[in-house]
Regions:
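Active-site helix of classical SDR
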Residues: 126, 161, 169
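Substrate-binding pocket helix/loop in short-chain dehydrogenase/reductase
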Residues: 101-103, 107-115, 209
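Residue(s) in the substrate-gating loop at a strand-loop-helix junction
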Residues: 145
């Protein structure tokens, strides 16, 4: 099915990471073009090579630290310039955090890591991509987490950053609606390399967590999360904004 995204320019932060790689493949199937940003060049360049090899995609890459506003502005403007001043979709995927620490075990540095790499980075990318998104009547897809919605123990800084992203996204959906910019939030549970390593280390805990998912598995970055993102960026979702989409196999259900 043609989702109407051929030749659309998609900016993805954390573009070399595992979840991003799946999302990129989903958009590449639709004929999209890419601006990839990341603080780590290795994974990003590997993603570029994969997209060019497997799909013939046009890919522009640039190193940027999302917590530094000047670097974000430079990356956004350079990417847009490469594609003749165009950005159609912004996907804020990048996030780092300390995990497994109780609230009182967190240092300020631990908290800063989550907030700066997630909340501030999302803010900076949205702020500087806005003129291009306004011109294209584009879409923003921001990543949050069930960690904040469900109050998961050991994830206070991560949850704080992600809930901040959700709140900011809803405000942007209200403010940018008159510009025909859609802003939505995705909360995924995805099988990643880190999760596979955890399964090897603690198989019993892994099985316990998987059994808490009604559909009985972790999501696939391309087929599950990526396809939801494709929908949210497509004309089919033109009347969807300010919403949080739980891509968690039913584990995100709340009364």
């Amino acid at each position: 099915m043609d989702m109407g995204l051929k030749d659309k320019v998609v900016l993805i932060t954390g573009g070399g990471g595992g979840i991003a790689r799946g999302i990129e493949r989903a958009f590449a199937t639709e004929g999209a073009k890419f601006i990839l940003t990341d603080v780590f060049p290795g994974g990003m360049e590997a993603a570029k090579e994969e997209l060019e090899r497997d799909f013939g995609s046009e890919v522009f890459t640039i190193i940027a630290n999302g917590s530094v506003e000047d670097e974000v502005k430079r990356a956004v403007d350079a990417g847009a310039e490469h594609f003749d001043g165009r950005i159609d979709v912004l996907i804020n995927n990048a996030q780092a955090s300390a995990s497994g620490l109780t609230l009182v075990q967190h240092s300020k540095e631990d908290f800063d890591l989550a907030v700066q790499s997630g909340l501030y980075a999302t803010f900076f990318y949205m702020k500087h991509a806005y003129p291009y998104l306004k011109e294209s009547a584009g879409s923003v897809i921001n990543f949050a987490s069930g960690a904040g919605i469900g109050g998961n123990p050991g994830q206070s800084s991560y949850a704080a950053a992600k809930e901040g992203i959700r709140g900011m996204s809803r405000v942007a959906a209200s403010e940018w609606g008159p510009d025909n910019i859609n802003v939505n939030i995705v909360c995924p549970i995805v099988m990643t390399k880190a999760l596979e390593e955890w399964r090897e280390r603690e198989p019993e805990m892994y099985e316990k967590n998987m059994k808490a998912i009604p559909l009985g598995r972790f999501g696939d970055a391309e087929k599950d999360v990526g396809r939801v993102c494709v929908f949210l960026a497509s004309p089919d979702a033109s009347f969807v904004t300010g919403d949080t989409i739980m891509v968690q196999g039913g584990s995100g259900m709340k009364p």
